[in-house]
C-alpha cells in the first residue's frame, strides 16, 4: 500500500509587499534583496487573518482537486510555527472550519522542514491503513515573527499556505508506483542558535522575534540537504538524475542553486517560487508544488524530489511519484 497524492492546493493572502515597500522603512533596496536572495515580493496576511484561515483555503482547494469533500477527511496534519493559539492545535481549528467529521488532527512543528516531516507522519497513517483521506497542510504567517528593524531577516519571509490530499493506492512495489517512495529526516539540536525565535510560553511568556545567522545556515543547508537528498533517493531506489522535478524549500535562490548544483540537478528541473513568495517556512514546498501543477510543468506520473531545512536545525527530503 502506498500513500498517493491525489490533490494539491494553495492560498496566498491578497496583500503583496514588494522590496520597494520594505525600503520605505528599513535600510535596504530592491537591488540589495534580489542580489542576495532572489526575492522580489512576498504576501502578508491581514491583521485579522489567522493561520487557520490560510490553511482552510488551501485545504479546500486541495480537496476539490482530489474530488473529495470535508466529509471524507479522517486525518489532518498542519505543519506550522505560527499557529492561531498556543493550544489547541491549529489542525483542530481547521477541522472545525472545514466541517470535517471526528477524526485525527494535530500539528507538527519543525519550522521550514515541517511539511516534509508532516508528509512522513501522514504516510505512516495512510500506508498502514489508518487513514483513507489525509490532509497535510503547511501554513505560516511568518511576518508576525519579524523584527522589522533587522534587514537581514525581515526581507526574507512571507505568509501563505499549501496543502495536499493523501489517499491509499495499490502498487507493484516498484519505483513506477505512484505515491511516497522514500524519506530521509534529520535534526541536530546543537545548531539551535543558528536559527530560532527568542520567545516562548515557558521561557519569556512572549511570542518573540526571529533571529538568524544567515551565513552559517547557508553553509549547513547546502551540505546537509544534499546528504538527505541522496539518502531519500537511495531509500526510494532511484537516482537523483532520474527525478523529473525538484521542489525545494524556498529559503533563498542561492541555497536552491547551491543544493541543485551539489546534487547535479539541472536548473531547468527546479521549481522556484522564492521570487514571488519569499520564504514561507512550512508552506513553501506545497505552495511551489501547487505552482508547478498550475503552470503545467508537473504532471501525473512525474517523479518529484522535495527537500527542506529549518530551525533546530531540522532538515529532510522526500521522493514521491505523483
UniProtKB/Swiss-Prot annotation:
Domain of life per record: Bacteria
BP term (GO), one: fatty acid biosynthetic process
GO cellular component, as recorded: cytoplasm
Subunit structure comment from the entry: Homodimer.
Protein localization: Cytoplasm
Species the sequence originates in: Caulobacter vibrioides (strain ATCC 19089 / CIP 103742 / CB 15) (Caulobacter crescentus)
Similarity comment text for this entry: Belongs to the thiolase-like superfamily. FabH family.
Catalytic activity: malonyl-[ACP] + acetyl-CoA + H(+) = 3-oxobutanoyl-[ACP] + CO2 + CoA
Region of interest called ACP-binding, as start-end residue ranges on this chain: 250-254
Protein name stated in the entry: Beta-ketoacyl-[acyl-carrier-protein] synthase III
Residues forming the catalytic site: 112, 249, 279
Comment on protein domains: The last Arg residue of the ACP-binding site is essential for the weak association between ACP/AcpP and FabH.
Cysteine disulfide partners in this protein: none
GO MF, one example: 3-oxoacyl-[acyl-carrier-protein] synthase activity
Stated role: Catalyzes the condensation reaction of fatty acid synthesis by the addition to an acyl acceptor of two carbons from malonyl-ACP. Catalyzes the first condensation reaction which initiates fatty acid synthesis and may therefore play a role in governing the total rate of fatty acid production. Possesses both acetoacetyl-ACP synthase and acetyl transacylase activities. Its substrate specificity determines the biosynthesis of branched-chain and/or straight-chain of fatty acids.
EC number: 2.3.1.180
Pathway: Lipid metabolism; fatty acid biosynthesis
Alphabetic keyword roster: Acyltransferase, Cytoplasm, Fatty acid biosynthesis, Fatty acid metabolism, Lipid biosynthesis, Lipid metabolism, Multifunctional enzyme, Transferase
